[in-house]
């Protein structure tokens, strides 16, 4: 079966030949004795022009087709006599599968992104979101391709977990208990031993802890899947459900980790630019002017590197008045991250060696006993897109840190076993897939790069 993509990519092979196409009406113009249909079949960003003339058996019915109607076209592919396209199909027969209801909400006019979020089940049919979600598909493939080409094993991490990988407690709890009759312990706490799994369980915030177990068997591994955060951050950069790519490398320190992250980012950007030229041209023209310049700057330059302490000094000396005051020990806010990436370095930059008190329990302690071997990658226009660290591989230091943070060792027994049975230096990071999508496309809101966004007070569709 020939697709619209075949016509755009290999049109000369089908020129002056009879072809058959299936698809949806994107636009229709009726000129009384002839008409034009822009047909899109989902295989390509652009649609192909169908010319139908008065001699068509069901000309009147075709002339009255509405946007989103589904049809089958038989005709000849010819060189176009008009401007706007090189090739078009002269229809000999058009079969109508269904004439769409005239109340179809996405007529041929500009709609705001806010409005289209209320029509998430239909918005992939628009030019913008067709481009967004096609790039999302290609980007996901590029990530798998990068890791497979570099001999990483793909691991499926569980969605349901009994531990908190971040130690932050911002998790969605899973339960089958009757909320009107919750079993309680003598001390008044919920008795989760009566629950489905016999213990308290949650949706995962990260696949890292499980992934590390496979790192000890397969050396270099990665997982790619949904993660969940129950934090009330109603911003353009946060979602309650999002996807993360998480690699772990055995016998690699934080410097090897940064090299991997930089190679990955450059690989996936180039892959998408090479394989989605029409979509990326659309984003460059209509979503973010200068997008190509920004992405080529990433491809053609080494990423910056700065320690957290140096970053604080840069921010303090900037002379810029920040909403959140700068001092050593704070967690960098979006405004700080963007200043570093956009105004100071003017390119992606790694920030390393953060204070231990603002990072997760599993990060390796530096010799100063104040900082850990953590790294974040900050990108212009969006801030943090990658967060990672060298992992603490010393059993005593890890358990000491867990006690300091009040974590229950029993919940992490399998994780601690890794430090008892053949511990080894290793490192890993997480790439926020949607953040990368925003950076690649210029889209400004995370809700517009996820098919069905989940945010506080919103779980439609």
From Swiss-Prot:
Recorded GO CC terms: cytoplasm
InterPro entries: Aa-tRNA-synt_II, aa-tRNA-synth_II, aa-tRNA-synth_II/BPL/LPL, Asn-tRNA-ligase, Asp/Asn-tRNA-synth_IIb, NA-bd_OB-fold, NA-bd_OB_tRNA
GO biological process, one term: asparaginyl-tRNA aminoacylation
Keywords of this entry: Aminoacyl-tRNA synthetase, ATP-binding, Cytoplasm, Ligase, Nucleotide-binding, Protein biosynthesis
Gene Ontology molecular function, alphabetical: asparagine-tRNA ligase activity; ATP binding; nucleic acid binding
Catalyzed chemical reaction(s): tRNA(Asn) + L-asparagine + ATP = L-asparaginyl-tRNA(Asn) + AMP + diphosphate + H(+)
Top EC category: ligase
Major place of residence: cytoplasm
Origin: domain of life: Bacteria
EC code: 6.1.1.22
Keyword flag ATP-binding: yes
tRNA processing listed as a keyword: no
Subcellular location: Cytoplasm
CDD domains documented for this protein: AsxRS_core, EcAsnRS_like_N
Subunit record text: Homodimer.
Protein family: Belongs to the class-II aminoacyl-tRNA synthetase family.
Protein name: Asparagine--tRNA ligase
Lineage: Bacteria, Fusobacteriati, Fusobacteriota, Fusobacteriia, Fusobacteriales
């Amino acid at each position: 079966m020939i697709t619209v993509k075949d016509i755009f990519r290999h049109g000369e092979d089908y020129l002056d030949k009879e072809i058959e196409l299936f698809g949806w009406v994107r636009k229709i113009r009726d000129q009384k004795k002839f008409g034009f249909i822009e047909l899109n079949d989902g295989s390509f960003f652009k649609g192909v022009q169908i010319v139908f003339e008065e001699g068509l058996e069901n000309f009147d019915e075709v002339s009255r087709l509405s946007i989103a109607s589904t049809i089958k076209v038989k005709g000849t592919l010819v060189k176009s006599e008009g401007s706007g396209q090189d090739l078009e199909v002269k229809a000999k027969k058009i079969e109508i599968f269904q004439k769409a209801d005239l109340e179809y909400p996405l007529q041929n006019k500009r709609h705001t992104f806010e409005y289209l979020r209320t029509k998430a089940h239909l918005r992939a049919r628009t030019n913008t979101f067709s481009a967004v979600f096609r790039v999302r598909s290609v980007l996901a493939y590029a990530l798998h391709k990068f890791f497979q080409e570099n001999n990483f094993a793909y691991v499926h991490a569980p969605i349901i977990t009994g531990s908190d990988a971040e130690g932050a407690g911002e998790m969605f709890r899973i339960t089958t208990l009757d909320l009107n009759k919750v079993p309680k312990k003598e001390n008044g706490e919920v008795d989760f031993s009566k629950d489905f799994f016999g213990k308290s369980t949650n949706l995962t915030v990260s696949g890292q802890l499980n992934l590390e177990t496979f790192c000890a068997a397969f050396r270099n591994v990665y997982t790619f899947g949904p993660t969940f955060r129950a934090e009330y951050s109603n911003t353009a950069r946060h979602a309650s459900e999002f996807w993360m790519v998480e690699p772990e490398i055995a016998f690699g320190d934080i410097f090897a980790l940064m090299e991997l992250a930089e190679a990955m980012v450059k690989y996936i950007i180039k892959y998408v630019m090479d394989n989605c030229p029409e979509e990326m041209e659309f984003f460059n023209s209509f979503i973010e002017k200068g997008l190509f310049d920004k992405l080529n700057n990433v491809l053609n330059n080494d990423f910056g590197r700065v320690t957290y302490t140096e970053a604080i000094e840069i921010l303090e000396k900037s002379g810029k008045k920040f909403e959140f005051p700068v001092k050593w020990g704070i967690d960098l806010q979006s405004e700080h991250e963007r200043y570093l990436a956009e105004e100071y370095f003017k390119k992606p930059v790694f920030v390393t060696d953060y204070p231990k008190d603002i990072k997760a329990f599993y990060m390796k302690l530096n010799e100063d006993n104040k900082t850990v071997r953590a790294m974040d990658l900050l990108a212009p226009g969006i801030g943090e897109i990658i967060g990672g660290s060298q992992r603490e591989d010393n059993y005593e230091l890890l358990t000491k840190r867990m006690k300091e943070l009040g974590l229950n060792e029993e919940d992490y027994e399998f994780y601690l076993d890794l430090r008892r049975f053949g511990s080894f230096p290793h490192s890993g990071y997480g790439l926020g897939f949607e953040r990368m999508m925003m950076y690649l496309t210029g889209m400004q809101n995370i809700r517009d790069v996820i098919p069905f966004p989940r945010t506080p007070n919103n779980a439609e569709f």
